[in-house]
Amino acid sequence: LSVDGRSITGANIIIATGSSVFMPPFLALEGENHLLTSTEALDLDQVPASVTVIGGGVIGVEFAYLLNRLGSKVTVLELMDHILPMVDIEVSRLAEKRMTKDGILFRLGAKVSRVKDDTVYYEFGGQNCQVKSDMVLMAVGRVPNTQGLNAEGIGIEFDRKAIRTDAHMRTNIPHIYAIGDVNGKVMLAHTASHEGMVAVADICGQGE
């Protein structure tokens, strides 16, 4: 492993470089003054009066719930026909019903086409629609941080943009492991913590 011209060696290597927010370029270009990522939203000095959340996955729903509780008027735009696509549909429907009761507006099956300043343009139910808000939160997903690793150069295999691993977090190169968002399995902090323990247990001979 080479870092800033310095070589580091080890019997085993664990890659844990995480992920970054996926930001569609055409959206960021016109809405950069109002368009925020979940990381940037955590640094807000005050609660916005209104928020449009693009994406109804874990991060989008989490922030929609939080901001609604803090007093924001929240609209969630989701391309699929239900929120939280990684959970059972019954759980998804219950969460949507409860959050709708709390005042959150969901637009399911909405296809966002453009973000310009404080306005989000989208297609919904065969019509062109738009919604204005003080803040637009981009939460359509994350991408593994693999740039600069030269992983392909040493023969590490990928599953799309994520590093492929087995149940023990091993890559196809036995002494190299990948944990957390970079392996693309489940992009949640507690999952990364567990995967770290799995990898260390395997390195210590306790993998079974």
Model-identified regions with their sequence ranges:
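Short glycine-/small-residue-rich Rossmann-like dinucleotide-binding loops
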Residues: 18-19, 124, 137, 141-142
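Rossmann-like dinucleotide-binding cores of NAD(P)H-dependent redox enzymes
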Residues: 42-43, 48-52, 58-128, 185-193, ...
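FAD-site-proximal beta/loop scaffold in flavoenzymes
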Residues: 30-47, 130-207
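A general beta-strand register signal
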Residues: 2, 107, 121-123, 157, ...
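Glycine/serine-rich phosphate-binding loop and adjoining beta1-alpha1 elements at the start
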Residues: 2-34, 50
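Core beta-strand elements of the Rossmann-like FAD/NAD(P) dinucleotide-binding domain
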Residues: 3-12, 126-135, 172
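Short glycine-rich hinge loops at helix-strand junctions in the catalytic core
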Residues: 18, 71, 101-103, 155, ...
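Short loop/edge segments at beta-strand edges and connector loops
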Residues: 3, 17, 37-39, 108-110, ...
